[in-house]
């Protein structure tokens, strides 16, 4: 894995430098999150990438049936499995400030420690296994997932989350996206 940006010629797009199509997407994103994340400024260089990301992300949030804390555990599991420090920091902030992830669970996730909450531990483990096995999780983990009270549709929504986070995680790898100040307190060392 490279520690330097592999995309060299494309630069972050600002509202001032955006084409009309890019501007509409970025403006919508700013209205949703209150600022222009560096990740979005990079993704919009290929407008279909940001558009697909925002659409899928919104559907996962609104339709997955996961509680907000569970959604964040899914996103953290994927981002960690993909080695994306930007998204791990960003979702750590959301987990801490907005989604109600218990502090001990967030600490365990960020530090690679066992998660004491069995439902969230099962969700985290299965999600990571889906990523690491390219969609072929261990049958025992799936059985534990059902036993924890999750349904088959939840597994499909994990696939959606993996798809969405792959767009963001891989874009961040290619650009070596600079962490936004908003997420600085959650930066991984």
Where in the sequence are the language-model features?
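Hydrophobic alpha-helical segments
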Residues: 1-189
């Amino acid at each position: 894995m490279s520690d330097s940006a592999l995309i060299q010629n494309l630069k972050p797009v600002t509202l001032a430098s955006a084409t009309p199509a890019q501007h509409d997407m970025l403006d919508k994103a700013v209205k949703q999150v209150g600022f222009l994340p560096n990740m979005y400024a990079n993704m919009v260089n290929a407008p279909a990438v940001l558009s697909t990301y925002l659409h899928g992300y919104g559907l996962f949030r609104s339709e997955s049936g996961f509680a907000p804390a569970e959604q964040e555990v899914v996103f953290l599991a994927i981002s960690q499995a993909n080695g994306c420090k930007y998204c791990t920091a960003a979702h750590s902030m959301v987990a801490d400030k907005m989604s109600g992830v218990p502090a001990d669970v967030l600490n365990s996730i960020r530090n690679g420690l066992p998660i004491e909450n069995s439902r969230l531990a099962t969700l985290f483990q299965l999600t990571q296994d889906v990523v690491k096995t390219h969609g072929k999780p261990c049958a025992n983990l799936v059985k534990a997932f059902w036993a924890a009270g999750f349904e088959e549709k939840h597994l499909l929504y994990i696939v959606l989350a993996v798809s969405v986070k792959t767009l963001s995680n891989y874009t961040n790898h290619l650009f070596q996206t600079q962490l936004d100040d908003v997420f600085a307190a959650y930066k991984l060392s």
